[in-house]
């Protein structure tokens, strides 16, 4: 298996000047440590109906939830990317991590590439490179095209593996000479949970009482989507390594969101529950990527609702990442739940995990305190 290493995305509340006179400066970090900023297409670009772009699931989700904002304009990066790159230079950043809007680049499933969308990303990447900013590119950041959701339910259908691979092929071919770091999927675990268990992010599917989802099945869909994400990643990784890696010299990986879990007491039950939380939240994606299969704990608890890798699929997923991207914000203590995991009724991801999470510091759906110290336990 190819060596896998962690690429850690760290969010800083202040900028470093590049000098070593400050109490805390770049000089406190090893040579080669990369300081950068990060965003995604829907959070940054705006221009949602310009130059041939078609809606993504984020557009439909935001405009069908009246109490939500939307990304119609947002930072207006589509028009102001040169100003933003100048800010990066002024802030002394080394890198910019952004995502490509699939529905801007390919507005129809197997139709032609949108030349205006293509030119935007070429211009952005060239602007970054011209100013010494390394582009880190994500292919999917929660925003597959709405036309795929309408046609075959998007990530719930294995058909998306082929379409995602075709989309990635365009990106590698058109941008790969200047892009050395590719992430196929951003936070695969969170996309699966938020979009298909909780219903609080696109495409907004769930079956949890009180969540007001129109469609969905929280007992099965998160696991199906997670499975297809991994298969799509493996397919795209294989394409890159076979056709592009030697010529372009880049790396390709997959990212997850991690939480620093620790037991709330010294009891054996809480220690076991903490391991179970790690297996469900982190091992769900990491297990297949590193070992070729899901954690035994998940397979035992989820049972027949858990998709199964064929021997060939297992070998394709195992070792398919040159790196694992870690997005880290939070820490939580874990208490074993006295409730038995649901085997009937309406099980979901959290009832399967069957723990009580208590987040450290302030936490709400809209804001929370970052816990950088917990990343040591994650690693």
Curated annotation (Swiss-Prot):
Per the UniProt entry, the signal peptide is: 1-20
Catalysis: reaction(s): Hydrolysis of terminal, non-reducing beta-D-glucosyl residues with release of beta-D-glucose
Keywords from the UniProt entry: Disulfide bond, Glycoprotein, Glycosidase, Hydrolase, Signal
Which residues are noted in the entry as a beta-D-glucoside-binding? 43, 141, 186-187, 329
- Provide the residues annotated with a glycan attachment (glycosylation): 217, 362
Q: Which InterPro entries match?
A: Glyco_hydro_1, Glyco_hydro_1_N_CS, Glycoside_hydrolase_SF
Q: Does the keyword Ubl conjugation apply?
A: no
* Known EC number: 3.2.1.21
- Which domain of life, per UniProt? Eukaryota
User: Any S-S bridges, and between which cysteines?
Assistant: 206-213
Tell me which Gene Ontology terms the entry assigns under biological process. Answer: carbohydrate metabolic process
Per UniProt, what is one GO molecular function of this protein? beta-glucosidase activity
Gene3D superfamilies in alphabetical order:
Glycosidases
Q: Identify the catalytic residues.
A: 187
**Annotated family:** Belongs to the glycosyl hydrolase 1 family.
Q: What is this protein called?
A: Putative beta-glucosidase 6
Originating species: Arabidopsis thaliana (Mouse-ear cress)
